């Protein structure tokens, strides 16, 4: 727990107005367990609109985090607000476990329409990416009558027990304290920039893809082909926006078909237009068996979904998809509105266009600052890999200093990645061009200050990060 004295010391290192924020920060540390998250800055959200947020002290920020890629349509979008208000006036919710409810059925129609696959599909719901991952695991096991699940090192799938067990980014020693479920197996993800095989995946993507596929097939055979599902983020998000070779994803799908394994496409972060496609998997020309969606689906309201082949979804017996508030009417109404906003405002196309622009701008910075080792992304899901100059060695502390200075200058942009050294860029898909440009300007100023040693090491003690 950070002491009162430590927070009193913060005035030595920042001139930012944060007195009202600190009141809540101290209460948070008193009442909320530390396991509830990483707190990057001593700021408390007071209100938000579009691509901007304001804290308790009235400081205004451009939001490049969007609550961890939740607000694809921007904060408090009028269309989403209207849908929520209209549904609340009718009724909050009634359990789908016993009666029929219209909004989740209408939402299912839309999800079936916008997901890949020209076959009959069905949809089940939850409240977070974590529980949706759990539901996808249930479906894979019920359908195949097998038990083992293969996922990837440095993946992030959530914190319910099934999702936690599938997640590969956590410190194994810490994870072991919670006794994760058995029958989960992790293999290496083909990271083109930094992998254990020493392969430059940008220069030789085929070699990287084949090395990873060989490891997966060995694992399948080691498990006597008793594998129910392989769960994959088409682009690893919290690992630092890691994009595998296209042929890897295509050949992985072929491998699952060969062995009768369910291909689970985890789109919690990459879905809903974030990568310049409705779903990240569409960059690879692959049709999954199951798609997991959450985060941006509800436009800020908590809802998740698993969309999958009808025969797989119907293999799960009653009542194993039931939650009391499954398909919550208010949240489902928000999700319907969110999908309609993305369609009407052409945000998928906008994400692709702005993403290309951002990659160009950030790669121009890379030419100036050798501490930028790699810039990668699709659409408006972008990672900037901060390294020790002249190497590929991650520089986590420097990345955190850049993030801190950006906050001081009015930009919310945290760090993440398997080494904690990647700048996370995921603004709303409808962010105004001027906000995008101002954000890049702040990033450059913050990098310059960090490189020139203008950000003291002491700020790191106020920043809890990946």
Swiss-Prot record:
Residue ranges of coiled coil: none
InterPro entries: Aminotrans_3, Class-III_PLP-dep_AT, PyrdxlP-dep_Trfase, PyrdxlP-dep_Trfase_major, PyrdxlP-dep_Trfase_small
Field pH dependence: Optimum pH is 6.5-7.5.
Cofactor(s) in the UniProt record: pyridoxal 5'-phosphate
SUPFAM superfamilies per record: PLP-dependent transferases
Protein name: Broad substrate specificity amino-acid racemase
Enzymatic class: isomerase
Keyword Isomerase: yes
UniProt KW keywords: Isomerase, Pyridoxal phosphate
Residue list for modification N6-(pyridoxal phosphate)lysine: 295
Activity regulation details: Inhibited by hydroxylamine.
Function of the protein: Amino-acid racemase able to utilize a broad range of substrates. Can use Met, Leu, Phe, Ala, Ser, Ile, Val, Trp, Tyr and Thr. Is mostly active with Phe, Leu, Met and Tyr, followed by Ile, Thr and Trp. Has weaker activity with Val, Ser and Ala. Shows no activity toward Pro, Asp, Glu, Arg, His, Gln and Asn.
Pfam families: Aminotran_3
Catalytic reaction(s) noted: an L-alpha-amino acid = a D-alpha-amino acid; L-phenylalanine = D-phenylalanine; L-leucine = D-leucine; L-methionine = D-methionine
Known partners and oligomeric status: Homodimer.
Alphabetized GO MF terms: identical protein binding; methionine racemase activity; pyridoxal phosphate binding; threonine racemase activity; transaminase activity
EC number of the protein: 5.1.1.10
Family: Belongs to the class-III pyridoxal-phosphate-dependent aminotransferase family.
Temperature-related behavior of activity: Shows extremely high thermostability. Retains full activity after incubation at 80 degrees Celsius for at least 2 hours.
Binding site residues for pyridoxal 5'-phosphate: 129-130, 269, 324
């Amino acid at each position: 727990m950070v002491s009162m004295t430590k927070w009193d010391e913060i005035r030595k290192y920042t001139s930012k107005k944060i007195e009202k924020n600190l009141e809540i920060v101290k209460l948070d540390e008193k009442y909320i367990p530390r396991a509830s998250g990483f707190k990057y800055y001593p700021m408390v959200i007071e209100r938000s609109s579009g691509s901007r947020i304001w804290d308790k002290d009235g400081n205004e920020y451009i939001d490049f985090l969007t609550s961890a890629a939740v607000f694809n349509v921007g904060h408090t979008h009028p269309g989403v607000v209207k849908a929520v208000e209209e549904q609340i006036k009718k009724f909050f919710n009634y359990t789908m476990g016993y009666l029929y409810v219209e909004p989740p059925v209408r939402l299912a129609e839309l999800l079936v329409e916008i997901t890949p696959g020209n076959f009959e599909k069905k949809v089940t719901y939850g409240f977070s990416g974590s529980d949706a991952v759990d539901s996808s695991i249930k479906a894979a096991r019920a359908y195949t009558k097998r038990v083992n699940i293969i996922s990837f090192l440095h993946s992030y799938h959530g914190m319910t027990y099934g999702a936690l067990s599938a997640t590969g980014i956590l410190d194994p020693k810490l994870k072991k304290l919670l006794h994760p479920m058995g029958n989960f197996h992790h293999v290496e993800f083909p990271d083109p920039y930094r992998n254990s095989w020493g392969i430059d995946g940008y220069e030789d993507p085929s070699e990287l893809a084949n090395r990873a596929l060989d490891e997966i097939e060995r694992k399948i055979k080691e498990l006597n082909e008793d594998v129910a599902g392989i769960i994959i983020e088409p682009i690893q998000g919290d690992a630092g926006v890691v994009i595998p070779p296209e042929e890897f994803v295509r050949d992985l799908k072929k491998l699952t078909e060969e062995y009768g394994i369910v291909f689970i496409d985890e789109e919690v972060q990459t879905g809903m237009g974030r990568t310049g496609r409705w779903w990240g998997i569409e960059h690879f020309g692959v049709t999954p068996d199951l798609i997991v969606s959450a985060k941006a689906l509800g436009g800020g309201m908590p809802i998740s979904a698993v969309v999958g082949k009808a025969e797989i979804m119907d293999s799960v017996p009653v009542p194993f998809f039931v939650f009391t508030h499954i398909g919550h009417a208010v949240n489902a109404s928000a999700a319907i509105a969110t999908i309609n906003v993305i369609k009407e405002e052409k945000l998928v196309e906008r994400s692709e266009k702005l993403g290309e622009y951002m990659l160009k701008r950030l790669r121009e910075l890379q030419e100036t600052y050798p501490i930028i080792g790699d810039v990668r992304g699709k659409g408006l899901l972008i990672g900037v890999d901060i390294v020790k100059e002249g190497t590929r060695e991650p520089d986590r502390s420097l990345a955190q200093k850049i993030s801190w200075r950006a906050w001081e200058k009015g930009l919310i942009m945290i760090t993440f990645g398997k080494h904690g050294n990647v700048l996370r860029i995921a603004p709303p898909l409808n962010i105004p061009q001027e906000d995008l440009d101002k954000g890049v300007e702040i990033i450059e100023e913050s990098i310059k200050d960090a490189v020139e040693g203008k950000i003291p090491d002491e700020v790191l003690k106020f920043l809890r990060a990946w």
